[in-house]
């Protein structure tokens, strides 16, 4: 009963020291589509499952992997509408930085500012936490970066990670397969294999999305390129 009294209050701690609404937001992430991020020696890859609930759905009308700036990409696990708002805000942050300083925003600066926005939604009245975790990848200072930001506003730098449904199995798989010597193509293969760990049904170029970032910038792979990668995996 004590927990129930605090479960609908965002700004009140429970007696055990928890913000229960944050735990609910993390539950939304844990039930969301699996997403994976892997740093390679010459780039970084992010990938996610993007299954459609109906064959009548217009494929590729809504993307889960999004470009934020020329050298930064983002993917999520959790609630799609919340993600759309964060994509919009992240792009605005990147553009404002460029207009102010006349140079592209560093990946770490973007992550910090997006995470600050997410944190503000954990201690403000009349709002709720974002029901998403983000993987933000990018390239600057001649090297790749990969960060994860959670509904609490906490963020971490990773070499490789998985989130969403079956995240524990995904991380276990990555711990066995990851190497800092991975080339970008090998990292894409590893990301696909990680998604396959908990994938139900047949994986095709239409039900996963992949983004890569290297010294040439960020791009979301088209279905034809993904199909080629899938063909090379037994």
Curated annotation (Swiss-Prot):
Highest taxon above the source species: Eukaryota
Compartments where located: Cytoplasm; Nucleus
Keywords (A to Z) from UniProt: Cytoplasm, Nucleus, Proteasome
SMART domains named in the record: Proteasome_A_N
Cited Gene3D superfamilies: Glutamine Phosphoribosylpyrophosphate, subunit 1, domain 1
GO CC terms: cytosol; nucleoplasm; proteasome complex; proteasome core complex; proteasome core complex, alpha-subunit complex
InterPro entries: Ntn_hydrolases_N, Proteasome_alpha, Proteasome_alpha-type, Proteasome_asu_N, Proteasome_sua/b
GO terms of biological process kind: proteasome-mediated ubiquitin-dependent protein catabolic process
Main location: cytoplasm
NCBIfam families linked: PRK03996.1
Subunit structure: The 26S proteasome consists of a 20S proteasome core and two 19S regulatory subunits. The 20S proteasome core is composed of 28 subunits that are arranged in four stacked rings, resulting in a barrel-shaped structure. The two end rings are each formed by seven alpha subunits, and the two central rings are each formed by seven beta subunits. The catalytic chamber with the active sites is on the inside of the barrel. Interacts with Rpn6.
Function summary: The proteasome is a multicatalytic proteinase complex which is characterized by its ability to cleave peptides with Arg, Phe, Tyr, Leu, and Glu adjacent to the leaving group at neutral or slightly basic pH. The proteasome has an ATP-dependent proteolytic activity.
Similarity field: Belongs to the peptidase T1A family.
Name this protein carries in UniProt: Proteasome subunit alpha type-2
């Amino acid at each position: 009963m004590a927990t129930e009294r605090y479960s609908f209050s965002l700004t009140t701690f429970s007696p055990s020291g928890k913000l229960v609404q944050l735990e609910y937001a993390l539950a939304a992430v844990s039930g969301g589509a699996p997403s994976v991020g892997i740093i390679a020696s010459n780039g970084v890859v992010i990938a996610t499952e993007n299954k459609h609930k109906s064959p009548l759905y217009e494929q590729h009308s809504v993307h889960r992997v999004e470009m934020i700036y020329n050298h930064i990409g983002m993917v999520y696990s959790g609630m799609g509408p919340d993600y759309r708002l964060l994509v919009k805000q992240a792009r605005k942050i990147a553009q404002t930085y460029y207009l102010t300083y006349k140079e592209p925003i560093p990946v770490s600066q973007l992550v910090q500012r997006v995470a600050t926005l997410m944190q503000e939604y954990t201690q403000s009245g009349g709002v709720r936490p974002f029901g998403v975790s983000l993987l933000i990848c990018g390239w600057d200072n001649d090297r790749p970066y990969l960060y994860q930001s959670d509904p609490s506003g906490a963020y971490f730098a990773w070499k490789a990670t998985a989130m969403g449904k079956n995240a524990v199995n995904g991380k276990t798989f990555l711990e066995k397969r990851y190497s800092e010597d991975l080339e970008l193509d090998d990292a894409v293969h590893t990301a696909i294999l990680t998604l396959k760990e908990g994938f139900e049904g047949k994986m095709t170029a239409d039900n996963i999305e992949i983004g890569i970032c290297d010294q040439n910038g960020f791009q979301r792979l088209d279905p034809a390129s993904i199909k080629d990668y899938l063909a090379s995996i037994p």
